[in-house]
Amino acid sequence: MDLPGPIHDFLLVFLGSGLILGGLGVVLLTNPIYSAFSLGLVLVCISLFYIPSNSHFVAAAQLLIYVGAINVLIIFAVMFMNGSEYYNDFHLWTVGDGVTSLLCTSIFVSLITTIPDTSWYGVIWTTRSNQIIEQDLISNGQQIGIHLSTDFFLPFELISIILLVALIGAIAMARQ
């Protein structure tokens, strides 16, 4: 999508602030329903990030799969659980919460100070062969596969890591 510079920048700032507010809502809200709705906001903002980079199919797939299926499943699971068990033993801060908060804050501060100082122009994420340029001989499914394995490799891997962490968290919660 070819947007003028100020509109593109405003869109990125708007979606980024939606991501930050939704992420804070997921972590800080004590009601699990509100937290699940905040997760839905985060997933919608992530899917909308793909639209300015002209990957409408990935945005639609992200929206359908994560918001339409996963988040609705999480909301149904939270609604079927007993809500009183969340509030019985509610302590404001424990030692583990403090250590986790300190660790996450230090990682966040180190990333905020490191990322702007890094020269990203020398980093080559992927290499494309000359065969990919000839797109007339390639079907749409193959083009999606090529784009997922070259142009969108990093977001695809980050999504797979997020799914792995969610799966491990679900297994840990089910064992308790």
Swiss-Prot record:
Cellular compartment(s): Plastid, Chloroplast thylakoid membrane
Family annotation (Pfam families): Oxidored_q3 (PF00499)
Location, primary (coarse class): plastid
GO molecular function: NADH dehydrogenase (ubiquinone) activity; quinone binding
Gene3D superfamilies tied to this protein: NADH-ubiquinone/plastoquinone oxidoreductase chain 6, subunit NuoJ
Source domain of life: Eukaryota
Bilayer disposition of the protein: Multi-pass membrane protein
Catalytic activity of the protein: a plastoquinone + NADH + (n+1) H(+)(in) = a plastoquinol + NAD(+) + n H(+)(out); a plastoquinone + NADPH + (n+1) H(+)(in) = a plastoquinol + NADP(+) + n H(+)(out)
EC numbers, comma separated: 7.1.1.-
Top enzyme class: translocase
Entry keywords, A to Z: Chloroplast, Membrane, NAD, NADP, Plastid, Plastoquinone, Quinone, Thylakoid, Translocase, Transmembrane, Transmembrane helix, Transport
Transmembrane segments: 10-30, 32-52, 61-81, 92-112, 152-172
Cellular-component GO terms for this entry: chloroplast thylakoid membrane
Family: Belongs to the complex I subunit 6 family.
PANTHER family given in the database record: NAD(P)H-QUINONE OXIDOREDUCTASE SUBUNIT 6, CHLOROPLASTIC (PTHR48479:SF1)
Function as written in the Swiss-Prot or TrEMBL entry: NDH shuttles electrons from NAD(P)H:plastoquinone, via FMN and iron-sulfur (Fe-S) centers, to quinones in the photosynthetic chain and possibly in a chloroplast respiratory chain. The immediate electron acceptor for the enzyme in this species is believed to be plastoquinone. Couples the redox reaction to proton translocation, and thus conserves the redox energy in a proton gradient.
Quaternary structure and interacting proteins, as annotated: NDH is composed of at least 16 different subunits, 5 of which are encoded in the nucleus.
Designated name of the protein: NAD(P)H-quinone oxidoreductase subunit 6, chloroplastic
Organism of origin: Platanus occidentalis (Sycamore)
